[in-house]
Amino acid sequence: MTSGQQPATIRLFQITDFHLRTSPVDTLNGVVTDLSFRNVLKSLNPLEIKASDHILLTGDLAQDPDPITYQRLKSYLKHLTCPVYCLPGNHDDPETMNKALIDADIRYESQIELGTWTLICLDSTIRKSPKGRLSLAQLDLLESNLLSAKGDHIMIALHHHPIPCGSEWMDTMTVQNSDEFFHVLNSSSKVRAIVCGHIHQAFDRQQDNIRIIGTPSTCFQFTPKSSDFSIDTIPPGYRVLELMADGNIRTEVVRLNELPEGLDIGSSGY
């Protein structure tokens, strides 16, 4: 493989929903979210991240979207030797995120070419709302990027889940105009998968021949198939995706060995 050439299989690490606070010792549902996130980052070390790998941060990077929060996140990521891409979640402030976090090493780009794959990143946030929606501008951007994608295969990344995950309370906060979203997606025969955050749980389904993948949070997890807010008794984690040259995807969720210290299992929300 020559310098600058992508490997046949692209390895992508999806890390999501950190919910970092203004102070690194502040908690959310009993969890010091900074510490839990840093523990997840440390767990990546045995996998020997290479310069040819990629890391994707799919929103809710901050619970308190202040410049100091994003600047501290940048300091946590500075040791990584591979490209890092990010997009906002409903708890983020996209403008503050752009100013305080984005630089040459941490990028917020709508279209990323990865060998035979193209990654398209979207902003599904609605200001001051937990629900998701793709604005007309985002739908237009998606349509344009689908047309200009150089890869044979396309993966879409956004924060909100575009189809129900099976938890009644969480499914009030999907992409509200998912019909419009899938209408645009179905204009291309290249779309293979959608990856999202937001749901704080592992998820893997098919719709319209597109694989839809959700990933655990780095802090607390939500109980699958719950009618009301419920915290699960399962450790934090992240997802490894191997994007094959033929359009197939191999993926697994990797979790820490223990629950975060202080986790409030009985919490009724945040």
Task: Label the predicted regions.
Residues 17, 59-60, 89, 159, ...:
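Active-site glycine-centered loops adjacent to acidic/histidine catalytic or metal-binding residues
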Residues 21-24, 63-68, 90-97, 127-130, ...:
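Active-site environment of divalent metal-dependent phosphoester hydrolases
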Residues 210, 214-270:
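Acidic, His/Gly-rich catalytic cores of divalent-metal-dependent hydrolytic chemistry
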Residues 9-22, 116-126, 155-157, 210-216, ...:
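Active-site-proximal beta-strand elements of phosphoester/diester hydrolases
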Residues 1-72, 165:
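N-terminal active-site segment of His-dependent metallophosphoesterases
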Residues 40-54, 132-211, 247-250, 259, ...:
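His/acidic metal-ligating clusters that form di-metal
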Residues 26-32, 128, 167-174, 227-229:
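Short glycine-enriched, charge-decorated loop/helix-capping segments at active-site entrances
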Residues 3-4, 66-153, 174-190, 216, ...:
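Extended active-site neighborhood of metal-dependent phosphoesterases/phosphodiesterases
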